[in-house]
Amino acid sequence: MRILSVGWFRKTSNTSFHRHEALKKHSTYIDKVEAGPTSLSLAYRIAFRSFQMGLPVKLPDQMDVNKKIRTLITQNGYDIVWIDKGLTVDASTLLFIKKKLPNAKIVSFSPDNMALRHNQSQNYLESIPFYDYTFTTKSFILNDLMNLGAKNVNFIHKTYSENFHYPRKISNKEKERLAADVGFVGVWEKERCDSIIYLIKNGVKVKVFGDGKWNEYQDKYDNLTILPGLFSEDYPKALQTFKISLCFLRKMNYDQQTARTMEIPACGGFMVAERTEEHLELFKEGKEALFFSSNEELLEICKYYLSNEEERKNISNAGLKRCQASGYSNEKTVEKMLNIVLGLK
């Protein structure tokens, strides 16, 4: 199978990179087009802001993604053109692919809620009808995507990478730097910040790896440590070394599950996540992960399991086994998606 893969591949912790690596395992030949700029230009920022204000302004193609796609399509034949999110991919480029390679399948994948404007672009909205298959990790937006013109819309759960998210041998120096009673890795949002402050005000020590607005809380509370975000192998190591690893959902995306949902248990971490129907389907509550619906319940869980190491270990081990047994990996999930595209499932 010959694949052209388009996405953001610069960081080894990027899920787009992990999907590309999974695609490589299922291809006989693969090319890639890097769509992620090292920094966003002023023109890009202005265009994005204008689009968010409701104007039909397209994002500038800083990385010449469309030109590179057209060049490769002209030079090589592909069975599948896989586009991760594709905010700067133009409809005219997809039509070019269809003209040059009428038998190729064009696939759209995004881990974000693409029914919401803050995740979209004008380029994306104009391109939606020309994708042959659309995959989303949001079970509740299938009809929304179809109303935008998407065809063959499929829901796929979040995933972890077998080559990146796994239990590691961790040195004592790494433990000193990364370990925490309760830890969280991620961006600031009000609800999750409120939950963390509730914990620290009730005697629980929390370590946060995050940038931006988190820096405003540096040295503000005795029980709170703020450190820079993690984007290397320190990320899975941290999830493994936290006694309790918090998994919050993005309220602005109405998430039912998130990347951390799979990554924490896959790394051998003890996950405490927000309670949702999808979380309860993915992991057995109290056996493979813990869930909470209020700050009071979160505090109760943290205090109990910080004092019960053996139970934490048993649940962490069970969560890891569930990830493996249920096929939550990128490799298994990408294989499932490719089978759908090829009509094998």
Give the location of each predicted region.
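Surface-exposed amphipathic alpha-helices with a cationic face
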Residues: 94-101, 200
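Nucleotide-sugar donor-binding catalytic core of glycosyltransferases
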Residues: 1-45, 51-53, 61-71, 75-76, ...
